[in-house]
Amino acid sequence: MNQTPSRSGVAWKVTLILIPLVTLGLLLWLRNVEVAALRQRTVSSYGTVPSFQFINQNGQPFGSAQLAGKIWIADFIYTTCPGPCPMISSRMSELQKPLEKTDVQLVSFSVDPEKDTPEVLRSYAERLQAEPGRWDFLTGPKSAIYKLSHDGFKLAVSDGSDAQGIPVHSTRMVLVDRHGQIRGYYDATEPEAVTKLLADTNHLREQPK
């Protein structure tokens, strides 16, 4: 004789199914609220990035001319970095998927350009699965890159000649608008860096060109 499941048993199973769905929905709602709130805040301006031109991982000239009229995000790294560079590059890599349908560019400047040749940077880019045409890795004269970091982006940098002999640089990612104005700094070592950076980037994208 078949037994009909009790109402309490069915209700318990339904509850077990609904709890994770409701929890997931709540988490997604909270994330959307957080991003929306961040997008409402004013995005400050911290000065203009000077004109520059270096060589990218493909051996091609790349600089201000290629970025004119575009929103872009910059960082300073080097491929043999034993410290924060892998995390910084990982954060930059995280930006690729949410920005894939935009024209926002990613630019990584090497602070060890003598070792980071275009070939070395190309290999590094491949390991990060950097999207061609979106994420460029730049090398060039050390003095010019350091001047751009210090005077242009207002970020400290040193070749380490007075310490352990390894380059020392900022862990911040920098948001630049279509007019070459610096609009935000985001420490890649902070868990919420990507969320805040994406919110501000989307805010700038919504502004008239």
Residues covered by each model-derived region:
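N-terminal targeting signals for export/organelle localization
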Residues: 1-51, 208-209
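Short loop/turn microsegments at loop-to-beta-strand junctions
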Residues: 49-50, 72, 170-172
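Hydrophobic beta-strand positions
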Residues: 53-54, 175
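Short active-site neighborhood of thiol/selenol oxidoreductases, capturing the structured segment around
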Residues: 62-92
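Structural microenvironment flanking redox-active thiols in thiol-disulfide oxidoreductases
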Residues: 89-148
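Structural micro-motif
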Residues: 135, 146, 153-159, 167-174
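Thiol-/selenol-based redox modules, centered on thioredoxin-like
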Residues: 161-209
